């Protein structure tokens, strides 16, 4: 049913576009991740399956269609993410904010998480989304500092950290939960992973997801290492020991993996 509704509403889900391996599990739990602002990204990160090129024109009706779909499906948790839209002055922040606002109007019980780009450091864009009142703000660091410029040539490691820091500072919701995610298997070391975790904790990041990098095609960055389940367990323990409220680590873990569960854990967290 969810796929039918998404298709009929002319919506994109990152579950499909990014070929997420957990699509069935999340949809069964009334959690879905919607990819707004089209299906074409203005950047060309060498790990990502989403197509790149010149995006389509802005669809101002998208927030209402998305909210109607969320309401009809009775979702418990909706994640809103997007392609990068560096062609737009605000990076698409207005549409992000409208999506949150429309969901709030139609299904107030649904928790909303936003997984945003860096908006090239435009804090007005970031603030406009925070004013709409998401429950969780997510921005992925993706990889360790050394490898970052190799796979995210148009991004910046320190800017990504600053986005997470600014989200906490700008939000009027002092209980805002922040979250980030990273891939492993790109050639990083254990020490580099730990350093990235420490960097994220320095900007008060609450939640962390860690998954195995899976090469979308032979044109993308090769896999340097396959992590074992035990190694993922060690990474989860490392993150929890460093103070994250919840760490989801595993071969098939992605940013939105059990997002509703992560949010509940953080919301009920006590030291």
Predicted regions span which residues?
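Core AdoMet radical
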Residues: 49-65, 72-123, 129-165, 179, ...
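Small/polar loops that bind or transfer phosphate-bearing groups
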Residues: 36-37, 114, 249
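Canonical Radical SAM [4Fe-4S] cluster-binding loop centered on the CxxxCxxC motif
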Residues: 25-62
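Auxiliary Fe-S-binding modules of radical SAM enzymes
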Residues: 1-33, 64, 68, 98-109, ...
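Glycine/Thr-rich phosphate-binding loops of Rossmann-like dinucleotide-binding domains
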Residues: 44, 88, 147, 218, ...
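Nucleotide phosphate-binding site architecture
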Residues: 21, 42, 145
């Amino acid at each position: 049913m969810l796929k039918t509704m998404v298709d009929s509403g002319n919506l994109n889900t990152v579950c499909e576009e990014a070929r997420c391996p957990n699509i069935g599990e999340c949809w069964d739990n009334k959690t879905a991740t919607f990819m707004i602002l089209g299906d074409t990204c203005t950047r060309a990160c060498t790990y990502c399956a989403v197509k790149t090129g010149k995006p389509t024109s802005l669809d101002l009706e998208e927030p209402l269609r998305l909210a109607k779909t969320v309401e009809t499906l009775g979702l418990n948790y909706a994640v809103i993410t997007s392609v990068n839209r560096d062609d737009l002055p605000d990076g698409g922040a207005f549409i992000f904010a409208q999506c949150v606002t429309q969901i709030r109007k139609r299904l107030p019980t649904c928790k909303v998480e936003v997984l945003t780009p860096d908006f090239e450091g435009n804090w007005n864009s970031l603030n406009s989304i925070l004013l709409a009142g998401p429950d969780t703000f997510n921005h992925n660091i993706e990889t360790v500092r050394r490898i970052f410029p190799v796979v995210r040539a148009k991004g910046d490691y320190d800017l990504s950290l600053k986005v997470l820091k600014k989200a906490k500072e700008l939000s009027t919701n002092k209980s805002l939960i922040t979250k980030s995610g990273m891939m492993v298997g790109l050639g990083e070391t254990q020490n580099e992973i730990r350093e990235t975790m420490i960097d994220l904790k320095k900007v008060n990041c609450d939640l962390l997801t860690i998954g195995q990098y899976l090469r979308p095609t032979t044109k993308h960055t090769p896999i340097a290492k396959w992590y074992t389940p035990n190694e993922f367990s060690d990474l989860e323990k490392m993150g929890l020991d460093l103070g994250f409220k919840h760490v989801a680590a595993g071969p098939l873990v992605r940013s939105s993996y059990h997002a509703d569960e992560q949010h509940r854990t953080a919301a009920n967290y006590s030291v």
